[in-house]
UniProtKB/Swiss-Prot annotation:
Its main location: secreted. The gene is ROP4. The keyword Secreted applies. SUPFAM superfamilies: Protein kinase-like (PK-like). This is Rhoptry protein 4. Keywords: Membrane, Phosphoprotein, Secreted, Signal. Residues 56-82, 559-578 are annotated as: Disordered. GO terms for molecular function: ATP binding. Disulfide bonds: none annotated. It comes from Toxoplasma gondii.
């Protein structure tokens, strides 16, 4: 009876010792799994973490690698996130371990006992040894977790930054694509042979202008105002004096030049104009220096730079030299600066203050602006009135053609005024001042100072208390301003189109009666207050009124050979309708 009692105490001690031994072995095995693999020191790029936390060569030729090795991307794709975000991963089977070269003994009774005790300690309730073998989880080492998280953060930053940079530079490229570029193509426009609008040679009526310039050689040298002289003094003191030689650098990527400054031409809206000559080639040109009596702003500088790129807005003719030849547009062929000079300088002359910009347009040479020319022929004596009327007819026909070129190129000038046209010595009429040029359909806030040459829709938008005050630039906008300029050519003033005016031929020409009927009717159609009903420039050249004016101009031009010699009698020219 005493044997069972005496035998029970030692057996309890044995079982307690065995339990402590099992717990110690478990702790030792878990601690071994936290050691840093020495293989990471060699090449982390060629390694991946297996589900058990072991290191497996990615480039192993083993046939079971796809089954046993889980890359970071594959794990994320199958689980919807990094496998490190899971509590654990499944262990490989003994047969798989043996195939990968890792020696793993078959599970013995003692090992099964250890696993059973381990799961019991963790609160596991799994019942079978096979289920425990497949479902066993192991804790991933801390350094492995940190490394994988750092890789994920680096990948997110890399892809996120590259995507954001792609969107940013894509937006920059899109803005740059919309901005006009100095694409100075050398080829002729594709429709050169079929488009009758293009200029190819002298046109009827140029001899009339040459005759007037011969009779009035000082027409381009009219007395300058006090403000013009003061502005020239400011430019001479701060930037470039008459007779001075300067080396200029191109803002458009063109070769540098050495220029000699000539006489002053006059003060134009963007700045001061004067003659210049290329010292190396002897090429004559007109230079325009940016000048303003108001404090210069960044917007003023940008406006000049945009005008230097305006030729890029044309649909077909994207070369300033070709635009000068085929369209008779005086677009700048270069935008230059004088190195070593400030971009903007404040200067004072004759008690007036102005700002001189170190930005210069280089343009083909001109002789006189149209507004000055019209003022001069308005002073002709009675006996020279037929010559003056023939010149007005020429200016009318050519102004319509020039604005039709704008429409044909898909652009809107936006600021057609009498001094937007100028004449060359050979009698050609040209259009200039493309600082406000935009593509048709753009929205622009029209300045209030051009009110009498602004169509009704532009005035209404500018005076509206609601909205941005912007006007949609259409071909009808330029057509209305064209009609106003033609009115000035014949009547020496802008038409009365203020509030309360009557839209009729009789009202407009009530104080200007000596105007041909075809001109009156054409102007009436061009300044129609209705945008939809207004006659456009391309339509105007097909009207009977315009055709009749062309015939009258051809007859008048036969009277002059261009050198001042009469080539016909008065009977060769039909009388202008009045």
């Amino acid at each position: 009876m005493g044997h069972p009692t005496s035998f029970g105490q030692p057996s309890c001690l044995v079982w307690l010792a065995a339990a402590f031994l099992v717990l110690g072995l478990c702790l030792v095995q878990q601690g071994a799994g936290r050691q840093r693999p020495h293989q990471w020191k060699s090449s982390e790029a060629a390694l991946s973490v297996s589900p058990a936390g072991d290191i497996v060569d990615k480039y192993s030729r083993d046939s079971t690698e796809g089954e046993n090795t889980v890359s970071e991307g594959e794990a994320e794709g199958s689980r919807g996130g990094s496998w490190l975000e899971q509590e654990g991963v499944e262990l490989r089977s003994p047969s798989q371990d043996s195939q990968t070269g890792t020696s793993t003994a078959s599970p013995t009774g003692f090992r099964r006992l250890l696993r059973r005790l381990r799961f019991w300690r963790r609160g596991s309730t799994r019942g079978s040894d096979d289920a425990a073998e497949v479902s066993r989880r192991t804790r991933v080492p801390l350094h492995t977790r940190l490394l994988q998280h750092l890789r994920r953060v680096a990948r997110i930053i890399r892809h996120g930054v590259s995507a954001a940079a792609g969107r940013l530079f894509g937006r920059v490229r899109q803005v740059e694509a919309e901005r006009p570029q100095p694409v100075f193509t050398e080829g002729d426009p594709p429709d050169l042979e079929t488009n009758s609008l293009y200029y190819r040679d002298k046109v009827p009526g140029q001899g009339i202008i040459q005759e007037i310039l011969r009779q009035k050689p000082g027409i381009a040298h009219h007395p300058e105002s006090f403000s013009v002289v003061a502005a020239d003094e400011r430019v001479s003191r701060t930037l470039w004096a008459e007779g001075g030689v300067v080396r200029v650098a191109s803002e458009l990527g063109q070769p540098g030049r050495v220029l000699v400054r000539g006489r002053r031409i006059g003060l134009f809206r963007p700045g001061m104009q004067f003659e210049a000559t290329d010292q190396a080639t002897g090429e004559p040109m007109t230079a325009l220096v940016g000048h303003t009596v108001l404090e210069a702003t960044a917007r003023d500088v940008d406006s000049m730079r945009n005008e230097g790129l305006a030729v890029g807005l044309f649909q077909k003719v994207k070369n300033p030299y070709l635009a000068n030849r085929y369209l008779r547009f005086l677009a700048p062929f270069d935008l230059v600066t004088i190195p070593g000079k400030p971009l903007v300088q404040k200067a004072k002359s004759r008690n007036e203050v102005g700002w001189v910009k170190n930005l210069l347009f280089l343009l083909p040479p001109t002789h006189v602006d149209m507004e000055t020319f019209v003022d001069e022929i308005g002073r002709f004596p009675q006996e020279d009135r037929p010559l003056a009327d023939a010149a007005r007819l020429y200016l009318t026909v050519q102004a319509v053609r020039l604005v039709a070129h704008l429409q044909d190129e898909g652009v809107v000038h936006g600021k057609i005024m009498p001094d937007s046209f100028c004449l060359k010595r050979e009698g050609g009429l040209y259009l200039r001042d493309f600082g406000s040029l935009v593509r048709a359909g753009a929205k622009v806030v029209v300045p209030a100072e051009y009110d009498e040459y602004t169509p009704p829709e532009g005035r209404a938008a500018a005076r509206s208390r609601f909205g941005s005050g912007a006007t949609t630039m259409t071909y009808a906008f330029d057509a209305w301003t064209l009609g106003s300029v033609i009115f000035l050519i014949w009547c020496s003033r802008a038409p009365d189109t203020k509030s309360g005016y009557e839209y009729s031929v009789e009202f407009f020409f009530s104080r200007c009666r000596r105007v041909p009927e075809n001109v009156k009717l054409l102007v009436y159609k061009l300044i129609n207050p209705s945008v939809e009903a207004r006659l456009l420039a391309l339509q105007a050249i097909e009207t009977p009124e315009y055709r009749e004016m062309e015939e009258q101009l051809s007859a008048a031009s036969r009277l002059y050979s261009g050198d001042g010699t009469l080539t016909g009698g008065d009977d060769d020219m039909p009388p202008l309708e009045t």
